């Protein structure tokens, strides 16, 4: 009886350890992917490419990314691109169109629409304004 009970507890403990190891591994994979994304924000980042980089199918990677980060891959990439664009608006003399195209927006109009949605002001107003909108930055 004692051996049986001990064996069940040992199995549960082993399963918990395996789940923990699995979570740790997935978190490490996602951290590596986040770093890779950060260095490639000015490139086309298709779900297939990012999932392949991680070594998963796109379906599994989407679920894993959301589980680990709390946001979808597309939302994360868009937020990071907009934040980088906001910094460039302040620190460079590049045109809004140049910045929009650099960060993979189809047009200045689509960039302005997304930028205004996140930062609550247009890119041109943001560039002229002296205060940094840190709350909207991701």
Curated annotation (Swiss-Prot):
Keyword Transcription regulation assigned: yes
Highest taxon, organism lineage: Bacteria
Molecular function terms from GO: DNA-binding transcription factor activity; sequence-specific DNA binding
Alphabetical list of PROSITE patterns matching this protein: HTH_ARAC_FAMILY_1, HTH_ARAC_FAMILY_2
Keyword Ligase applies: no
Residue ranges for the DNA-binding region feature of this UniProt entry: 48-69, 96-119
Gene3D superfamilies on file: Homeodomain-like
Key words, A-Z: DNA-binding, Transcription, Transcription regulation, Transposable element
Source organism of this protein record: Escherichia coli
Name of the protein: Transposon Tn10 TetD protein
Domain HTH araC/xylS-type as annotated: residue spans: 31-129
């Amino acid at each position: 009886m004692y051996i049986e009970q001990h064996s069940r507890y040992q199995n549960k403990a082993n399963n918990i350890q395996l789940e923990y190891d699995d979570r740790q591994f997935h978190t490490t994979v996602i951290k590596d992917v986040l770093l890779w994304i950060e260095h490639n924000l000015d490139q086309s980042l298709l779900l297939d490419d990012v999932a392949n980089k991680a070594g998963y199918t796109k379906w599994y990677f989407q679920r894993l990314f959301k589980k680990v980060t709390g946001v979808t891959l597309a939302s994360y990439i868009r937020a990071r691109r907009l934040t980088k664009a906001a910094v460039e608006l302040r620190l460079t003399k590049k045109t809004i169109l140049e910045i929009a195209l650099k960060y993979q927006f189809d047009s200045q109009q689509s960039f302005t629409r997304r930028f205004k949605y996140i930062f609550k002001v247009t890119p041109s107003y943001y560039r002229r304004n002296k205060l940094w909108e840190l709350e909207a930055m991701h």
